[in-house]
Swiss-Prot record:
InterPro entries, A to Z: DUF480, WH-like_DNA-bd_sf, WH_DNA-bd_sf
SUPFAM superfamilies: Winged helix' DNA-binding domain
Pfam families for the chain: DUF480 (PF04337)
Protein name (Swiss-Prot/TrEMBL): UPF0502 protein KPK_3478
Family: Belongs to the UPF0502 family.
Superkingdom to which the source organism belongs: Bacteria
Length: 217
Protein backbone atom coordinates (compact mmCIF):
# COMPACT_ATOMS: atom_id res chain seq x y z
CA UNK A 1 0.00 0.00 0.00
CA UNK A 2 1.44 3.39 -0.99
CA UNK A 3 0.06 5.28 1.99
CA UNK A 4 1.40 3.93 5.29
CA UNK A 5 0.12 6.20 8.05
CA UNK A 6 0.05 5.60 11.76
CA UNK A 7 -3.24 6.17 13.59
CA UNK A 8 -1.93 9.50 14.92
CA UNK A 9 -0.75 10.62 11.48
CA UNK A 10 -4.16 9.73 10.06
CA UNK A 11 -5.78 11.88 12.76
CA UNK A 12 -3.61 14.89 11.90
CA UNK A 13 -4.29 14.61 8.17
CA UNK A 14 -7.99 14.05 8.78
CA UNK A 15 -8.17 17.19 10.91
CA UNK A 16 -6.48 19.34 8.28
CA UNK A 17 -8.75 17.98 5.56
CA UNK A 18 -11.81 18.65 7.72
CA UNK A 19 -10.87 22.20 8.71
CA UNK A 20 -9.87 23.10 5.15
CA UNK A 21 -13.49 22.55 4.12
CA UNK A 22 -15.52 23.42 7.23
CA UNK A 23 -13.58 26.45 8.53
CA UNK A 24 -11.59 27.82 5.57
CA UNK A 25 -11.25 31.20 7.29
CA UNK A 26 -9.12 29.54 10.01
CA UNK A 27 -7.03 27.46 7.60
CA UNK A 28 -4.05 26.74 7.42
CA UNK A 29 -3.72 25.65 11.05
CA UNK A 30 -1.15 26.47 13.72
CA UNK A 31 0.30 23.74 15.93
CA UNK A 32 -2.11 24.70 18.72
CA UNK A 33 -5.07 24.54 16.35
CA UNK A 34 -4.00 21.08 15.17
CA UNK A 35 -3.70 19.91 18.79
CA UNK A 36 -7.22 21.17 19.53
CA UNK A 37 -8.62 19.53 16.39
CA UNK A 38 -6.92 16.20 17.11
CA UNK A 39 -8.21 16.08 20.69
CA UNK A 40 -11.82 17.09 19.97
CA UNK A 41 -14.36 15.23 22.08
CA UNK A 42 -16.92 15.23 19.26
CA UNK A 43 -16.64 13.75 15.76
CA UNK A 44 -13.57 11.75 16.77
CA UNK A 45 -13.28 8.01 17.38
CA UNK A 46 -11.32 7.22 19.41
CA UNK A 47 -10.95 10.42 21.45
CA UNK A 48 -7.23 11.20 21.74
CA UNK A 49 -5.15 13.31 24.12
CA UNK A 50 -2.07 14.26 22.13
CA UNK A 51 0.41 16.73 23.59
CA UNK A 52 1.77 19.72 21.70
CA UNK A 53 5.16 17.99 21.49
CA UNK A 54 3.62 14.84 20.03
CA UNK A 55 1.68 16.82 17.45
CA UNK A 56 4.75 18.85 16.49
CA UNK A 57 6.68 15.62 15.89
CA UNK A 58 3.82 14.28 13.76
CA UNK A 59 3.68 17.50 11.75
CA UNK A 60 7.44 17.46 11.15
CA UNK A 61 7.28 13.85 9.98
CA UNK A 62 4.35 14.50 7.64
CA UNK A 63 6.10 17.54 6.16
CA UNK A 64 9.17 15.40 5.42
CA UNK A 65 6.91 12.84 3.75
CA UNK A 66 5.33 15.61 1.66
CA UNK A 67 1.82 15.06 3.05
CA UNK A 68 1.84 18.56 4.60
CA UNK A 69 3.64 21.81 4.02
CA UNK A 70 4.43 24.80 6.20
CA UNK A 71 3.04 28.24 5.49
CA UNK A 72 4.66 31.37 6.91
CA UNK A 73 5.10 35.03 6.08
CA UNK A 74 2.46 37.63 5.15
CA UNK A 75 2.62 39.03 8.68
CA UNK A 76 2.21 35.63 10.36
CA UNK A 77 4.93 34.97 12.92
CA UNK A 78 3.40 31.58 13.73
CA UNK A 79 4.14 28.69 11.40
CA UNK A 80 1.00 27.12 10.02
CA UNK A 81 0.33 23.87 8.21
CA UNK A 82 -1.75 22.86 5.22
CA UNK A 83 -2.35 19.42 3.78
CA UNK A 84 -0.81 18.12 0.57
CA UNK A 85 -2.29 14.67 1.08
CA UNK A 86 -4.75 15.06 -1.79
CA UNK A 87 -5.63 17.51 -4.54
CA UNK A 88 -2.32 19.35 -4.21
CA UNK A 89 -0.59 20.83 -7.24
CA UNK A 90 2.12 18.18 -7.45
CA UNK A 91 0.43 15.31 -5.59
CA UNK A 92 -0.82 12.12 -7.21
CA UNK A 93 -3.99 11.59 -5.17
CA UNK A 94 -6.94 13.43 -6.69
CA UNK A 95 -10.33 13.15 -4.98
CA UNK A 96 -13.76 14.62 -5.65
CA UNK A 97 -15.54 16.63 -2.96
CA UNK A 98 -17.61 13.59 -2.03
CA UNK A 99 -14.53 11.38 -1.86
CA UNK A 100 -12.71 13.90 0.34
CA UNK A 101 -15.69 13.98 2.72
CA UNK A 102 -15.85 10.18 2.96
CA UNK A 103 -12.09 9.69 3.35
CA UNK A 104 -11.87 12.44 5.98
CA UNK A 105 -14.73 11.02 8.01
CA UNK A 106 -13.19 7.55 7.90
CA UNK A 107 -9.80 8.93 8.96
CA UNK A 108 -11.38 10.73 11.92
CA UNK A 109 -13.94 8.15 13.06
CA UNK A 110 -12.87 4.73 11.82
CA UNK A 111 -15.10 2.14 10.15
CA UNK A 112 -18.68 3.29 9.46
CA UNK A 113 -21.76 2.34 7.50
CA UNK A 114 -22.84 4.30 4.41
CA UNK A 115 -25.71 5.77 6.45
CA UNK A 116 -23.35 6.97 9.17
CA UNK A 117 -20.98 8.44 6.59
CA UNK A 118 -23.77 10.36 4.87
CA UNK A 119 -24.90 11.88 8.17
CA UNK A 120 -21.47 12.62 9.62
CA UNK A 121 -19.88 13.98 6.43
CA UNK A 122 -22.68 16.42 5.60
CA UNK A 123 -20.73 19.48 6.84
CA UNK A 124 -18.11 18.70 4.20
CA UNK A 125 -20.37 17.50 1.38
CA UNK A 126 -24.12 17.14 1.11
CA UNK A 127 -24.84 13.80 -0.52
CA UNK A 128 -28.06 13.75 -2.52
CA UNK A 129 -28.97 10.22 -1.41
CA UNK A 130 -27.57 6.93 -0.18
CA UNK A 131 -26.86 5.84 -3.74
CA UNK A 132 -24.32 8.66 -4.07
CA UNK A 133 -22.53 7.58 -0.88
CA UNK A 134 -22.42 3.97 -2.06
CA UNK A 135 -21.15 5.08 -5.47
CA UNK A 136 -18.31 7.04 -3.84
CA UNK A 137 -17.39 4.06 -1.66
CA UNK A 138 -17.44 1.72 -4.64
CA UNK A 139 -15.20 4.09 -6.57
CA UNK A 140 -12.70 4.36 -3.72
CA UNK A 141 -12.67 0.57 -3.37
CA UNK A 142 -11.96 -0.09 -7.05
CA UNK A 143 -9.61 2.72 -8.08
CA UNK A 144 -6.56 1.67 -10.10
CA UNK A 145 -4.29 3.65 -7.75
CA UNK A 146 -6.06 2.18 -4.70
CA UNK A 147 -7.97 0.56 -3.21
CA UNK A 148 -8.55 3.20 -0.56
CA UNK A 149 -11.52 1.66 1.27
CA UNK A 150 -12.75 -1.87 1.96
CA UNK A 151 -16.11 -3.25 3.03
CA UNK A 152 -16.14 -5.24 6.25
CA UNK A 153 -18.37 -8.30 6.79
CA UNK A 154 -21.81 -7.35 8.01
CA UNK A 155 -22.14 -7.65 11.78
CA UNK A 156 -24.91 -9.86 13.20
CA UNK A 157 -28.17 -7.95 13.54
CA UNK A 158 -26.94 -5.01 11.41
CA UNK A 159 -28.62 -3.93 8.18
CA UNK A 160 -25.54 -2.28 6.66
CA UNK A 161 -21.93 -3.31 6.29
CA UNK A 162 -19.26 -0.93 7.56
CA UNK A 163 -16.44 0.45 5.43
CA UNK A 164 -12.89 1.18 6.57
CA UNK A 165 -10.13 3.27 4.98
CA UNK A 166 -6.88 1.64 3.87
CA UNK A 167 -4.37 4.44 4.49
CA UNK A 168 -2.85 3.09 7.72
CA UNK A 169 0.16 0.80 7.96
CA UNK A 170 -1.66 -1.97 9.85
CA UNK A 171 -4.54 -2.28 7.38
CA UNK A 172 -3.15 -5.26 5.45
CA UNK A 173 -3.05 -7.29 8.66
CA UNK A 174 -6.54 -6.15 9.58
CA UNK A 175 -7.92 -7.08 6.15
CA UNK A 176 -6.39 -10.55 6.41
CA UNK A 177 -7.96 -11.00 9.83
CA UNK A 178 -11.34 -9.80 8.60
CA UNK A 179 -11.26 -12.18 5.64
CA UNK A 180 -10.41 -15.08 7.95
CA UNK A 181 -13.37 -14.22 10.16
CA UNK A 182 -15.79 -13.69 7.27
CA UNK A 183 -18.67 -16.17 7.16
CA UNK A 184 -18.40 -18.86 4.51
CA UNK A 185 -22.03 -18.37 3.58
CA UNK A 186 -23.73 -15.17 2.52
CA UNK A 187 -26.83 -13.81 4.23
CA UNK A 188 -29.27 -15.43 1.78
CA UNK A 189 -27.78 -18.90 2.31
CA UNK A 190 -27.79 -18.47 6.07
CA UNK A 191 -31.36 -17.18 6.07
CA UNK A 192 -32.50 -20.16 3.95
CA UNK A 193 -30.86 -22.61 6.33
CA UNK A 194 -32.45 -20.95 9.36
CA UNK A 195 -35.87 -21.04 7.72
CA UNK A 196 -35.41 -24.72 6.85
CA UNK A 197 -34.42 -25.53 10.42
CA UNK A 198 -37.39 -23.59 11.77
CA UNK A 199 -39.67 -25.60 9.48
CA UNK A 200 -38.18 -28.87 10.70
CA UNK A 201 -38.61 -27.80 14.33
CA UNK A 202 -42.24 -26.86 13.71
CA UNK A 203 -42.88 -30.22 12.03
CA UNK A 204 -41.27 -32.13 14.90
CA UNK A 205 -43.30 -30.13 17.42
CA UNK A 206 -46.53 -30.94 15.57
CA UNK A 207 -45.66 -34.65 15.47
CA UNK A 208 -44.80 -34.59 19.19
CA UNK A 209 -48.11 -32.88 20.02
CA UNK A 210 -49.97 -35.49 17.96
CA UNK A 211 -48.13 -38.33 19.70
CA UNK A 212 -48.85 -36.91 23.15
CA UNK A 213 -52.51 -36.49 22.20
CA UNK A 214 -52.78 -40.15 21.15
CA UNK A 215 -51.02 -41.30 24.32
CA UNK A 216 -53.47 -39.26 26.35
CA UNK A 217 -56.37 -41.05 24.70
Amino acid sequence: MKYQLTAHEARVIGCLLEKQVTTPEQYPLSVNAVVTACNQKTNREPVMSLSEGEVQTLLDTLVKRHYLRTVSGFGNRVTKYEQRFCNSEFGDLKLSAGEVAVVTTLLLRGAQTPGELRSRAQRMHEFSDMAEVESVLEGLATREDGPFVARLPREPGKRESRYMHLFCDDMDTLITTVEALSPLEDDDDLRARVEALEGEVAELKARLDSLLHHLGD
